[in-house]
């Protein structure tokens, strides 16, 4: 058994090299697929990114690992979370992105939140508040 880094590199090469011609690299702010914009939010991991999805003039943002808890890290976004690779940078990204989402009233979606994980962010003093909304389905 090797070191964790060595094992990671071995598995990454094994899994990524066969599909390297299909990989799409993107830059911060880039719409890399129609209606999908990448927004850099580093700190949880080096290249952590959240994604804004836009269709028919409506947008929502998929938060990824920006916040791991709908109350704790919303109300205290500057809190350093032990699972972030760079806790200070993660807190900076959290505040920056949540400020933008609240100011622009852009709905959010997160798999870390209770079902359906969809709602809005509002600014409250030094933090934020997540307001859940029921899932809307269009047929």
Regions found by a protein language model. Name each.
Residues 52-139:
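Cap/insert and terminal regions of metallo-dependent hydrolase folds
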Residues 36-42, 60-65:
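Active-site-proximal beta-strand elements of phosphoester/diester hydrolases
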Residues 1-40, 89-96, 102-105:
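Metallo-beta-lactamase
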Residues 42-43, 53:
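Active-site acidic catalytic loop and adjacent metal/ATP-binding pocket
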Residues 28, 47-49, 117-118:
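Residue-level marker for the onset of beta-strands and adjacent loop->beta junctions
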């Amino acid at each position: 058994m090797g070191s964790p880094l060595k094992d990671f590199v071995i598995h990454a090469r094994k899994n990524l090299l066969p599909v390297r011609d299909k990989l799409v690299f993107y830059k911060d702010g880039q719409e890399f697929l129609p209606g999908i914009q990448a927004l850099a939010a580093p700190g949880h991991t080096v290249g952590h990114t959240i994604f804004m999805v836009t269709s028919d003039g409506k947008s929502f943002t998929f938060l990824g690992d920006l916040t791991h808890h709908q109350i704790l890290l919303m109300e205290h976004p500057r809190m350093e979370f032990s699972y972030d690779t760079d806790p200070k940078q993660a807190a900076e990204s959290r505040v920056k992105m949540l400020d933008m989402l609240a100011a622009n009233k852009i709905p959010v979606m997160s798999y870390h939140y209770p079902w359906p994980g969809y709602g809005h962010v509002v600014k409250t003093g030094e933090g934020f508040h997540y307001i859940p909304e029921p899932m809307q389905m269009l047929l």
